[in-house]
Structures are given as structure tokens and as C-alpha cells.
Amino acid sequence: MKLAQGTVVGLIAGYYDVETATGIVRTRARGVFRQKKQKPAVGDRVEIQIDDKGMSYLVEILPRINRIGRPAVANVSHVLLVISAVEPDFSLELLDRFLTFFSWQKVNVTIYLSKADLISEQRLNEIKESLDYYQKIGYPVFIDYHHLEEKIGDMIKDNQIWTLAGQSGAGKSTLLNHLKKDANQTTGAISTSLNRGKHTTRKVELFKLGHGFLADTPGFSSIDLTPIKLNELCNYFIEFKRASKKCKFRGCQHIKEPGCEVKKLLEEGKILHSRYDDYLAMRTEINEGRMPEYLK
């Protein structure tokens, strides 16, 4: 009997594929997890028990950093956020929702603009101008796929787990197919009736990439921000949080308070107006406790 630690890299019909120092072990979870209403997720760091006959069981889930998405991925350290230039149309509002959600989850984000080759040069330049702002406040931005492919291996550090995210139809599975040639994810055309992609990814797996792992998760076009505390929302806009150190009042919400540094920077054009407008819209959403119908 021996114990080994590893990372859950796949779930298949009740079995868990666990990558250990000596290779991938396919194992089952002990019944105790059902009794405790615990379910191992892809990305979980786990301990498995292997008997003398080679039979193995998952016996412990090690402490998680986080657990996000449906299906869930655990211990996500970084998200590669795929935002489409067209089909579906580029949306700063949607970008801000994703960035706020992942900031709340304490997950770093890199932005990738997909389908840039399907729009005019003029439209691309307009989008680039908007994305320049996000790059300046601290988000890495990639528009050229080949540049992303060249850099991503070095960006994924030792045993980090990255996940793809973005609205349906943005091209996550297509991107994964490029990044991991044997991923064999299905790619689907846009559903014209909804202007959303068909949900073509039906399972979550981790793939070795760089020095860690990349997960593929199903696309989703809306994010529920209502669980965020209203007075904490401003902390998840990274440039607001930095500026708030110069606000006159601690806990400034950047609405009508005197001596607000965020409002000052907004008036000076140093904070994007659309970003501030999205912040106000999110405050209303959280205050009312429901997502706007058009975002569902």
C-alpha cells in the first residue's frame, strides 16, 4: 500500500484521471466523499492510495485555492479570456463583467481578441484603442494568435492551472485546438437565432501546456455578479483600487463623495468612461439583486 499526490486532469464516467510524478493514474473516489457531499473537481490536488494489486482510490482532496465555472475547475491561477471581435460583437461591457468577476475570484486574467481577421482595419484600430487602456492598467492583451502561441508556454508557470473563459462562440475551442494540437475539441458555428455559439464543449480536461496545465470549459455569455458585496465592488476594478488610496474618505464608493480620486481621474480622461459607466450599472444590478434581462 502506498500513497501518491497528484492533480485531477480529467473526469470520465465516475473515474478520475490523476497526474502523478510517475504518470496518469485512473482512479475512483472513496464513498466518504459522497457522505460529506464533496465532489472532486478537475484541477484538485489530491492524494490517492494504491494497493499491492495496483488498485487505486482517491482518498483526500487537498485544500483548494478556488473552484470556478460549470463544470467546475479547481485551483485556477489564471484565466485566458477570449473576447470576440465579431460574431458575437466586441463588447466592453461584457469584458468588464468578466474582469470584475475574476478579480473577485482573485484570478489573474490575460485578454485575447479572437476573430480580429474578420473585421475591417478601421474597426480593429478602434478595438485596439480600447484594449490599450486595459493593457495600461495591468492586463496583458494579445491580438495576434501567433504572438500568443509563442509566449503562452513561458507564461504558464510550474503546475499553474489556466482556464479558457469567454462568451459562447468567441472561439475558445478553436483557440485550444491551435494551442494543443491533439485536444480534439469540437468547434461549432454561431447559432444565428441567438447570435451565440452552440455549447460544443461537453467536458472539462486539463492539458499539459508550458510548465503547467490549460483547461477548456464550456462557453457562457453571462456572469452573475449579485453575490458580490456592494461596498466591495470598487475593489475589483483594479485602477479604482489603486486610485482609492488618494481618496479623501476611506471606503469611498466613487459616486458623490468629495475628494474622490477616481472621479478626478475620470474627469481628466485617465479612467475610461465606459468602464466607470459599467461600474455604476453593476452597482445597480447588485443593489437590486438580479441580473438585467438583456444579459441573461
Curated annotation (Swiss-Prot):
It comes from the Bacteria. The gene is rsgA. It is found in: Cytoplasm. GO terms for cellular component: cytoplasm. It comes from Lactobacillus acidophilus (strain ATCC 700396 / NCK56 / N2 / NCFM). This is Small ribosomal subunit biogenesis GTPase RsgA. Belongs to the TRAFAC class YlqF/YawG GTPase family. RsgA subfamily. One of its GO terms (biological process) is ribosomal small subunit biogenesis. One of several proteins that assist in the late maturation steps of the functional core of the 30S ribosomal subunit. Helps release RbfA from mature subunits. May play a role in the assembly of ribosomal proteins into the subunit. Circularly permuted GTPase that catalyzes slow GTP hydrolysis, GTPase activity is stimulated by the 30S ribosomal subunit. Its EC number is 3.6.1.-. Its cofactor is Zn(2+).
